[in-house]
Regions:
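Generic detector of short, locally flexible boundary/turn motifs and exposed helical patches
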Residues: 63-69, 88-92, 100, 135-136, ...
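Surface-exposed, charged secondary-structure patches
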Residues: 69-115
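Alpha-helix capping and helix-coil boundary motifs
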Residues: 40-43, 95, 131
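Short beta-strand edge/turn micro-motifs at domain boundaries
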Residues: 2-24, 114-164
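Core segments of small alpha/beta cavity-forming domains
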Residues: 3-79, 155-170
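Broad hydrophobic/π-residue packing in well-ordered secondary structure
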Residues: 34-38, 99, 109, 124, ...
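Extracytoplasmic/cell-surface-exposed regions of Actinobacterial cell-envelope-associated
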Residues: 2, 93, 100, 130-131, ...
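Short low-complexity stretches enriched in small and charged residues
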Residues: 52-59, 82-96, 134-139
Length: 170
């Protein structure tokens, strides 16, 4: 229980589970390798084994990309992005032979003479098996960072660029 400034109390709980770390290092390494390979088309060929491309998937959007999308989307289409700065890898959950890993980073892409910056979050759900690690789910969200440059305004409109469809947040 925590006491709040107004005198009220807030109750919370935390889950702490001690378990064998098992193959968590291999799963973290797979997430990092998968992520870095998407930046170079030729390196990404080995990722095709994880793809589950669906004909009903939106084959042109880069705001949200999953294993059901196209290989071209997975490899950033024609955007030509480069990772900038550190990529932050986080083990979000580990339960037996299942792990959820998140990688957060920034990427840049040239648009003519202008450089655009994007915030990227990748989520991996993996299952370890004795033969290999299975990629159960993958989702990459990408949102262009709004700079406020004058060329991003058109009359009464603001041009926001690539987003993941969650709307605008201040």
């Amino acid at each position: 229980c925590a006491s709040l400034p107004d005198g009220s109390e807030a109750w919370y709980y935390m889950r702490i589970v001690e378990q064998d770390q098992g193959h968590v290092n291999e799963m973290l390494a797979l997430a990092e390798e998968f992520s870095s390979k998407t930046y170079k088309y030729s390196d990404a060929q080995s990722l095709a084994m994880y793809m589950e491309t669906s004909p009903s998937a939106n084959s042109s959007a880069l705001g949200t990309v999953t294993l059901k999308d196209t290989f071209t989307q997975l490899t950033w289409g024609s955007l030509g992005v480069e990772r900038t700065g550190e990529a932050y890898t986080k083990l979000k959950e580990l339960s037996g032979n299942l792990a959820n890993v998140e990688i957060a980073t920034h990427v840049t892409a040239k648009d003519g003479e202008k450089t655009e910056t994007y915030e990227v979050t990748e989520n991996f759900t993996m299952k370890w098996a004795s033969q290999r690690i299975y990629m159960m789910d993958y989702e990459r969200t990408m949102t262009e960072l709004f700079t406020g440059d004058s060329d991003l305004f058109s009359g009464k409109r603001i041009i926001l660029g690539i987003g993941n469809g969650d709307g605008v947040h201040a």
